[in-house]
Every structure is written in C-alpha cells, then in structure tokens.
Amino acid sequence: MAISTPMLVTFCVYIFGMILIGFIAWRSTKNFDDYILGGRSLGPFVTALSAGASDMSGWLLMGLPGAIFLSGISESWIAIGLTLGAWINWKLVAGRLRVHTEFNNNALTLPDYFTGRFEDKSRVLRIISALVILLFFTIYCASGIVAGARLFESTFGMSYETALWAGAAATIIYTFIGGFLAVSWTDTVQASLMIFALILTPVMVIVGVGGFSESLEVIKQKSIENVDMLKGLNFVAIISLMGWGLGYFGQPHILARFMAADSHHSIVHARRISMTWMILCLAGAVAVGFFGIAYFNNNPALAGAVNQNSERVFIELAQILFNPWIAGVLLSAILAAVMSTLSCQLLVCSSAITEDLYKAFLRKSASQQELVWVGRVMVLVVALIAIALAANPDNRVLGLVSYAWAGFGAAFGPVVLFSVMWSRMTRNGALAGMIIGAVTVIVWKQYGWLDVYEIIPGFIFGSLGIVIFSLLGKAPTAAMQERFAKADAHYHSAPPSKLQAE
C-alpha cells in the first residue's frame, strides 16, 4: 500500500502532540509519587477517561467490530459483561481503594498496598505480586507493540521491523519523560479521539447504506442469525462471555487510576463520566461491525480486505467513507487505543521494579530524584524487552497474554475486593487467594472443563481461599483492625458538598 500523505501527516501531528504532553508533564513531576501516581492529583474527568483508555486497547476498534462483523450481534455479550464488571469495580472498589492505599503507608503500587494492608513482614506478598505483574505486563506490552506495528504496516506499507519501532517510539518517549501525569493526560486525549471515531463512523456507515431501517433489513436478509443474541450460545457460553467483567477487579493499570484520584469523593463523578464513555464506545464498536455487514454486503467489490481479515472492518470503512485527512484522524484512534494501554502497562512494570524491588530490597534510603530516574530507566528496559519479544509476531511467548486478563482478575481481583470490604481478612488469606486464583486459571485453561472461561472458577476458588485461610488462621492484629476501621470511616464520611453526594 502506498503511503497516504494526509494520513501520514495526521499520524505525525497526533504523535507529536502526545510527546509534547509528555514534556509538559515532566515539568510537573517533582518526586517519585508524582512519577508513579501523579501525586494523587487527578480530577474526576481525567480519572474517568484515563481509566477507560488504559482499559480499552486496540481490541475496541479492531477485535470487537471484527467479531460482530463475522458472527453478528451475539458477540456483544462480552461488551455487556465488561460494562457490568467495570460499573461494579467503580462502585465497590474505586473509592475504597483510593482511601485504603492512602491509609496503608500511602501505598503507590498494589504490591506495596498488600504489604501494608496485611502487615506482611516476610514481604512474600510484595515479591509474588510484583513478579506476576512484571511477567504478564511485559508480555502484554509486547502484544500491544505488535498491534501498533500491524497498524503502521498496513496503513503505510512499512516493513514490520520499521513499523515496530515507529509504533513503540512515541509511547516510550512520553512515558519515559512525563510518567503518570503524561500517561493520564494523553489517555484523556486518546479517549476523546476514540469516542469521536466510534460515534462518527457508524453514523456514516448507516447513512452510506441508506438509513437505519434499510441497514437492518440488509443485515437480516444476509442472515437472520446476525440479529440473534443467542446464536449458537448456551447458558455456559453466555456466562463465560460475561465473565470477562470479573477481570476488572484485578487489573493493576486500571486500579492505579483509582489510587491516583484527588479524593474518594470525586470517584462518584468519575464513575458517571467513565461509564458513559465506556457504554458509548462499546456501542459504537458493536455498531461499526454490525452495520458494516450491511455496507459491505451492498458493496462487495470493496469487501476484499475485510473478508480476508474481519478485524479490518473499522480501518476499511474509515478509508472508504471519509476523505484521507478525516480518515487519518479516525485511524489515529486505533493508535490511541494501543498507546494508551501500552503506556499504562509500561508504567506499572516500572513502578513494580522501582518501588517493590529496587527500593524495598536494594536501596531503602534512595532519594526521590534517584527513584524517578530509576523509574524512567525501567520504562526503557521493559520497553526494549517487550520490543524484543514483539520482533517475531509469531513468538509463542505472546500466547501467554491470553492468561493475563484472567490471571490478574483471578489472582488479584478477589484479594483487592476483600481487602477493602472485609476487615477480618489476613495475610495468609491474601496469599492463599492469590495463589489459588492464579493456579486455577492455569489448570482450568489447560483442561477446559465445562467450557467455562477460566476467570470464573479462578475468581470463585480464589475468594473461597481468602475466606477459609483467613478464618482458620490468627485474627488480624489490633493495629490492622483499627487501620481498616479508620479507612472505612473515612470512605463513608460525608462529601464536602451536596453536589458530590450520590
């Protein structure tokens, strides 16, 4: 494919803008707290959109529309499950985690929080959770870099190797320079770009076909199963698809946004903004794939690339329906989705190494400036390892990413949820829940019992492990109980104004 000058220019302007935000954030980064959590200063709007953008990777604009285009509306169950899971996460975890991390030694990372919350003097929780984050997020990063490279490769006709570096460079630069603030501010811009693309594109597709009723009729004529929500699905399959929503409770890059909010009271507004954004984006992505069926059915001569790879449905519609300048902006939304998730994961890996390994075990007396620079160097190191893994897109290691969502959800999800909801939880309960949840996911995926998505049994057994081992062992210390009570009381305290009341 020949390089389109308008698309190249819009991509370059977009990337330059992200790097510029990184430099602006650099001026606001004074210490390690700023670099890792933005000094806990995010307002509700940035908290909301940053959480959304860090969650939704290229899957939102490629994977989901492609699945709907290929199989019809029945593929939207996963979107319903994700929406419910995200809402429950915002409702039960977000505000509480913001408070509890502050009350437990002002924890900057999940491993740091687990150590303080359960008074883990052995630091086993810190080591295990930090290593799990490093392993899976490095592979997650590699997977994101592959997605960005594929976009550059297909859009500009670059070689894969050139596309690999072009796609990763900008994200690495602004994350390296600006840290958490750069990542959160760019996430906000990227989330805005994503929702713009996912609202405008399906509207133009419907107009291109001749209207909503006409589009629906064409889709039904092609196959009535396209509009059947239960097509080929039984109860177990629907539960498995909706079970993806359980993953939200344990995703470190999303939970970090809650920890960075300026107040637990602002979480209420952030939840409303984020859920509105998420519902509109998921509905738009479903609509792109769904109405794309009608468009390409009416224009079979244009359907070659989509028939070969259904995940190109958004890309092809953007290039066909819009002039190259607008198409460039819309396709930048895919890059935005990839970059927003990648930058968050790079920063989580960097913080795990710097806070939970370097500072905790090697340099307890390290200065704030030293920690900031170690954090920056670790962003670079993790990125280079991820690029090395991504150099061969068929690398079998990348297959481990399929474990990551379920693994984090089952290993960390119940631990996070119980830690902010149940004062009787102990260190042994947390350790048992983490190990049982993770092992269940690995074993269940290998054997595929009952065809249930492995996060569901992992979450259930992990939760049971927490309750059983917490009740069997010694009760939490008086200090732990008191700290929990104070944090819980603070969480339930009245907001500063009635405007913030739920």
Language model regions located:
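Membrane-embedded helix-loop-helix hairpins and adjacent transmembrane boundary segments
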Residues: M1-E502
